[in-house]
Amino acid sequence: MRKTVLLGIVLAAAVAGAEQVVDISGIGNKKFTVSVNVGNAAFAKCLQKNLEISGLFIANPNGSVKVTGNVGAIQAVGGGKSLSCTTAFSDDRSARMAARQFANAMCEAWGQQKGFALDKIVFLKHGKQHAVGAAVPGDLCTCYADGYDIRQLTNDGKMSIFPRWKDENTVYFISDRSGATQIWEMNVATEQAKRKWSFRGTPTGIAVSPDGSKVAAILSFQGNPELYVLQGDRYTRLTETPFEVEGQPTWSPDGKKIAFVRGDRTQQIWVVDVATKKARRLTSRGGKNLDPDWGRDGRIVYIANGGQIMVMEPATGDASAQAVTTTGGWKHPSWARDGRHVVAGSGKSLFLVDTLKDGDKPRAVFNANGDWISPSWMK
């Protein structure tokens, strides 16, 4: 279970009048101004960072939403609303956890938007290839969207790819850590990993169903790489395309469909009904549409030609697609629970990307030496 941070939350008509709202062209629209003056520096810094990256607040010493107080008695007041944080914390890490919980509460109270401050991101620290033709090592890491509390889970020099959350305590990933490349399961708290499924050939992509009971996997043990659904010791094959290659699966929010990439020379995004196995094509513009991720609100984010982040409605495919970024080296976008932000890789860094028109500019999640790739956000 996620550590519970107790909050005393009271909605009250504490302050008369409406909040001060500012319209900042190019970095987000209609934000609440907020001032954070809290006795604990770790709490204050983490809270302000999470409020700003939510896209709802902008720091201002004279903000109409004021956060004041000290440990165990912190209060946010403004625009007829009041929230209290009565949590006691004794070190910087627990202060940041309390701040994240409070940031989520403020996002819901003032912006009616789900907060993502407590949702971890799992990603890879890309290593160096030891020999020509050898697998490139990649270590599993986690952090929060605020960039604090980065944690490296593996350090074995082995290849790890496609990390995906099963739940807040468990990550599935593909690795050659025991020799053959197979699907593994790791307890994030203990960092203990065990092999979950073993097949002939090499798995090349996985996705966990919304309820955590099934895994969509690209497997080649029957010949060509095809899309399967794994549940316990059972498997169901969903595709049969001997002259194509499948990859990069992602589940619909209701667990009834799976979007995936199909193609060898060109790549397009398709969707298949898990029950009927009927598939249809979602993209047709350009020849390289990759990295789909299906969000809670039903939209799919993906990478189009030229490394551009796009968002589309599955019902209409890329006829409805909207560009989120300009062309560039964007990769592996993953939705936040707010249905607004994604985390994505570009170059050697990870960025938070606001998908709203005229939303915030992309922000680096953290600044650290290394090659950071393949993020997946807990939803």
Label every PLM stretch briefly.
Residues I9-G17:
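Hydrophobic h-region of N-terminal signal peptides that target proteins for export
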Residues M1-T4:
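Positively charged n-region of N-terminal signal peptides that target proteins for export
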Residues E19-V21, G26-K379:
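Sequence signature of WD/YWTD-type beta-propeller architectures
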